[in-house]
A protein has these predicted regions:
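Acidic/polar surface patches and capping/hinge elements
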Residues: 140-146, 151-154, 167-199, 230-231
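Solvent-exposed aromatic/hydrophobic patches embedded in short alpha-helical segments
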Residues: 51, 80, 84-106, 117, ...
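FKBP-type peptidyl-prolyl cis-trans isomerase
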Residues: 38-66, 100-106, 159-170, 184-185, ...
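C-terminal motif of bacterial Sec signal peptides marking the signal peptidase cleavage site
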Residues: 24-27
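Peptidyl-prolyl cis-trans isomerase
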Residues: 78-79, 83, 215-257, 287-288, ...
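N-terminal targeting/tethering segments
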Residues: 33-152
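Bacterial Sec-dependent N-terminal signal peptides
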Residues: 1-12
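Extracytoplasmic
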Residues: 38-46, 51, 87, 113, ...
């Protein structure tokens, strides 16, 4: 679990590297005052703490640079650009609200360390990030590209450090029972075979159910599947007889209904009724399949336990933070974000 948490935290920190840049003030006179007023606009309240639009935008400068590059300096006149900025603002605001909620409740739990300790842990995370660069020059170049100094970036790491500390305390007593392990094993045996089970299907994709039924009728009369695929198929596989090559049973790259239908077939057989997916209607043939014995539960018990522990911990975390949010008297003023 510790390795996975570190990986997760590193992903958070990598995201921060790409999105933290304090906006510089532009313009002068009345324009400057208008911008200052906009930046002070309160867009959320959490407990008694206020979040301003300026604080939100301080995390979005790289987004603004991307928008300017795509839409030009007059991006504010572009509806699509402003809608994108609004969605990014709302996403950052959600993160900032949660940071406050988590820190507040971490303080109540007595698990938030001193500022010195938070600084130390943030520095450790920064050092880990530095190690991902081959040279210090590359690291400094990345900071410059993100528009941050090392000091300002360090500040952006602290909420993630605090969240991780609170997370570990919230989930520390989460367990996995033997019953949960057995149930998961029984329901996911295709994930624990000696080698990955796989099927090699071919298909003929058509637009209507009736077209698929007509193809099945022709197959029943002995016509060749590959020739029918070339004649009737509507996707790129028609030119190779509808062959989709090998697909593992656990693949997430295919529609679940389609894959289950393919797996259910014996080698050389085809579906007797059309298979409906978001793409249309399929007639599927099993060209070949390979199935292997399931490994004994004792061999995979620890791996299953780790998988379930992560799931249970995540569920506990979501449940806890959701409850905290309800008690935080959160007020979002989305109409002030445009």
């Amino acid at each position: 679990m510790e390795d996975n948490k570190l990986i997760k935290l590193k992903k958070i920190l990598a995201g921060l590297m790409a999105s933290t840049l304090m906006l510089s003030a532009v313009g002068c006179g009345m324009i400057e005052k208008t911008e200052a007023g906009i930046n002070k606009t309160v867009v959320a309240k959490v407990y008694k703490e206020k979040i301003t639009l300026g604080e939100v935008d301080s995390r979005l400068a790289t987004v603004y640079e991307q928008v300017k590059a795509q839409y030009g300096e007059n991006y504010k006149e572009n509806t699509e650009a402003m809608e994108y900025i609004k969605q990014q603002r709302l996403s950052v605001l959600d993160t900032m609200v949660n940071d406050i909620v988590i820190k507040n409740n971490g303080t109540k739990l007595g698990v938030i360390p001193s500022d010195e300790e938070v600084n130390k842990k943030a520095k450790e995370q920064l050092d880990e990030i530095k190690k991902s660069f081959e040279t210090d020059e590359e690291y400094q170049s990345a900071l410059k590209a993100a528009g941050v100094t090392e000091e300002s970036f360090l500040e952006e790491l602290k909420p993630a450090v605090i969240s991780n500390i609170v997370y570990e305390d919230v989930v520390k007593d989460v367990k996995v029972t033997d019953e949960e392990i057995k149930s998961y094993y029984d329901s996911n045996q295709n994930s624990y075979t000696e080698k990955p089970n796989r099927v090699k299907p071919a298909h003929i994709l058509v637009k209507t159910e009736q077209e698929a039924k007509d193809i099945i009728a022709r197959l029943d009369k002995g016509e060749d599947f590959a020739k029918l695929a070339a004649e009737k198929g509507t996707d790129g596989t028609k030119d190779n007889g509808g062959d989709l090559d090998w697909i593992e049973y656990t693949s997430n790259q295919y529609d679940k209904t389609f894959l289950m239908a393919a797996i259910s077939l014996e080698k050389g057989t085809y579906t007797k009724t059309p298979v409906s997916t978001q793409f249309g209607f399929h007639v599927i043939k099993c060209l070949d399949k390979e199935e292997y014995p399931v490994r004994p539960i004792d061999e995979v018990k620890e791996a299953i336990k780790n998988t379930l522990l992560e799931q249970n911990q995540y569920n506990k975390w979501v449940e806890t933070v959701t409850a905290w949010q309800k008690d935080a008297n959160i007020k979002l003023y989305e109409d002030r974000i445009s």
